[in-house]
C-alpha cells in the first residue's frame, strides 16, 4: 500500500454515462481494454534507481494491494449487472473511516452494511449520511471505478502529450456509439480468465504480452487505436484551425508502431547514454 501511495504516478480520465445500460456497456469495454492502455502508457521500469523487471511497476503494485478493493471486477460481465450489483460490491468492501466534525474516525475493516443498520462499532447508534457513502465509494480501487462517472485507472503518468492522449483514447472509444459497439465486438468474446491473464501479463511484458485470441497486445493496440480514431472523427469536434481530436492519438500511434512500451525507451537510455545513472532522467525528461 505504501509503495502504491508514495512511489507511483498515474494519469486518469473520468467519463460520463447517460443511462444504466450505457454505463454497463462502457464499464465492460473499459475494463476489458484497460490493460491495453496500461501497455501503451507503461513507463515505470525503475525502483531505487535500478531496473525492476517491469514495464509498469505501478500496475504490478496494484496486484499486491488489498484484493477486497482492487482488480478487474469479473461480476461486471455477469448477466443482469447494473447499479444494484455494484452497490452490493461496495457494501462488501471493508470500510476505512468515517469523517465527522472535521476528524477521521477509524473504521478499518468494519461493514457499511452494519453502518446502515446503526450498528457500526466505530459509531454505535449512528447511521450514514450520503457523504459517508460517497467517501466509501472512493476507497475501492479497481481498474475502472464507478461513481457518477467512470474512472479509467490503468495508465502510468507521463509527459504532456500522453496526458492529452489518454482522454482522447477513451473518449474516442466510449463517446461515439459506433466506436463503442465496435470496441464491444472486439472484447465481448473474451472470457474472464483471458481478461485476467491479460491484466497479469501486461505489467511485465507491456506490448509484447499475448492478447486474447492470439497475437500480441501491441497488435491489438493498433485495432483499438483505429476504433478510437474513428470515434473521435465521428464526434467532429474541431479546434480553431479545423483540426479534429484524432491528432491527440499520435503519440500512442508511434508507441504502437514501435511495438515497445515507453518503459523500453527509458531502459534503453539507462543502459546506453545514461550509463546506468538514473539521475539523468531529470535533465532529459522533466517538463
Predicted regions span which residues?
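Loop-rich catalytic cores of soluble enzymes, especially ATP-dependent carboxylate-amine ligases
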Residues: 1-145
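C-terminal amphipathic alpha-helical interaction region
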Residues: 228-287
Amino acid at each position: 500500500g505504501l509503495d502504491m501511495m508514495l512511489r507511483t504516478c498515474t494519469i486518469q480520465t473520468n467519463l460520463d454515462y447517460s443511462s444504466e445500460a450505457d454505463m454497463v456497456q462502457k464499464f465492460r469495454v473499459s475494463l476489458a481494454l484497460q490493460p491495453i492502455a496500461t501497455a501503451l502508457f507503461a513507463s515505470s521500469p525503475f525502483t531505487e534507481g535500478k531496473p525492476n523487471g517491469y514495464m509498469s511497476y505501478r500496475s504490478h503494485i496494484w496486484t499486491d494491494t488489498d484484493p477486497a478493493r482492487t482488480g478487474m471486477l469479473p461480476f461486471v460481465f455477469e448477466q443482469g449487472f447494473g447499479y444494484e450489483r455494484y452497490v452490493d460490491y461496495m457494501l462488501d468492501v471493508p470500510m476505512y473511516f468515517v469523517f465527522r466534525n472535521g476528524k477521521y474516525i477509524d473504521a478499518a475493516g468494519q461493514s457499511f452494511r452494519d453502518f446502515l443498520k446503526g450498528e457500526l462499532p466505530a459509531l454505535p447508534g449512528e447511521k450514514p449520511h450520503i457523504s459517508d457513502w460517497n467517501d466509501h465509494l472512493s476507497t475501492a480501487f479497481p481498474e475502472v471505478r464507478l461513481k457518477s462517472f467512470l474512472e479509467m485507472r490503468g495508465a502510468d503518468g507521463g509527459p504532456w502529450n500522453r496526458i492529452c492522449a489518454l482522454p482522447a483514447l477513451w473518449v474516442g472509444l466510449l463517446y461515439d456509439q459506433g466506436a463503442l459497439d465496435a470496441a464491444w465486438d472486439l472484447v465481448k468474446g473474451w472470457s474472464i480468465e483471458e481478461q485476467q491473464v491479460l491484466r497479469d501479463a501486461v505489467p511485465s511484458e507491456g506490448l509484447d504480452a499475448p492478447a486474447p485470441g492470439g497475437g500480441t497486445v501491441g497488435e491489438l493496440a493498433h485495432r483499438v487505436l483505429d476504433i478510437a480514431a474513428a470515434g473521435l472523427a465521428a464526434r467532429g469536434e474541431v479546434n480553431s484551425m479545423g483540426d479534429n481530436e484524432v491528432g491527440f492519438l499520435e503519440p500512442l500511434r508511434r508507441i504502437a508502431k514501435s511495438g515497445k512500451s515507453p518503459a523500453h525507451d527509458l531502459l534503453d537510455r539507462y543502459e546506453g547514454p545514461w550509463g546506468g545513472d538514473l539521475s539523468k532522467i531529470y535533465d532529459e525528461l522533466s517538463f
